């Protein structure tokens, strides 16, 4: 029987910690760690690490080129829609971890639910055990699914892993259909950066050095129903995977009726319809799933980001009973796709708590309201600077501004697009965080927490207005100087 009041030890030796965090074997002759290198950081010391050491060690041991633009920050605290850096400066979060912190940074309710798991010393691992949180999360996802028809849930730790799971699901489900040989996706799409996911994505930039693709895949223009019909009519495609809104592609919203037409065509040509709702799900657009705006029922939805409140890596997919059974309803295939952290208790707890918080606080309605405020302000800004801002688009609280190229005569000084220098100025001068889209550097995005106070949203939008006006004046001045 486990004594919950005691702590098990691997050996009878006493292990102490130096003040620098390295482990010392007190039973060794010279008092130094014989089994461990010197200089290891313990948790308490790591939490007290000074900013200079933090920067040095991160540049030494992680990907230093990710900070090459010089705008990385040492954020030490986050609460709802605010960050605090090591100097005590507050920063406003209008990107929300690219849609991760749907319920705000460090949501207290989700934290409390996770703490209850720790306090209860719950069993954390094992996808083959029965657990109440797994049952609750699966049931909730089924009830929240379009038409309550996607009743099977598979969980993972990130969006790319979720889409890798989708790839295997579809391949297994179509294994007895010899004419189904390929996947179909859209140009400029993004589905993650693991080897399979980058080839689902229709951007060659992320496929570099990864060829050959591990499966056959073709791409059609996003939002083009006619091109989709031509492709699907060949009868060769296992599935069509599509984002309801292309997030990394530049917050591209397809024409009305596009998803409904995709559903119709996939049914007609015996092709599974998979929606990647990793950026648009969990209430981001004002409905729980973006596809609900067209009242369609896909065969599978990939989810991630906002489903754990940003506190635990958590993702997965939901699928119809028919699709799931075609893939996994036999002992031969049931264990062909498992993962160490599949149905991890903390991920499930965060998922249940996040959904609960969204429902109890009606964040879908709040998203639609605040999204309306964002569009109203940004559309008015576009009318003031029509030569700078090409478009404002999105839905709910996933919003993008597309900018025109900077005049060629001053591109050497400022870069190709207005978006990047404005994003940098927002971070440096106004302490407001937004990001450019990975696949479209002419666009920067807003995905703020759905819990952001209206005052914070107003402050952030005012900063955007000021930054756009300031940079427009700077570019005009530079162009005028060049022409004289």
Swiss-Prot record:
Region spans: Disordered: 1-32
A GO molecular-function descriptor: identical protein binding
Class of enzymatic activity (EC top level): transferase
Cofactor: pyridoxal 5'-phosphate
SUPFAM superfamilies hit by this protein: PLP-dependent transferases
Record keywords, A-Z: Aminotransferase, Pyridoxal phosphate, Transferase
Modified residues (N6-(pyridoxal phosphate)lysine): 305
Family the entry assigns: Belongs to the class-III pyridoxal-phosphate-dependent aminotransferase family.
Descriptive protein name: Uncharacterized aminotransferase C27F1.05c
Organism name: Schizosaccharomyces pombe (strain 972 / ATCC 24843) (Fission yeast)
Lineage of source species: Eukaryota, Fungi, Dikarya, Ascomycota, Taphrinomycotina
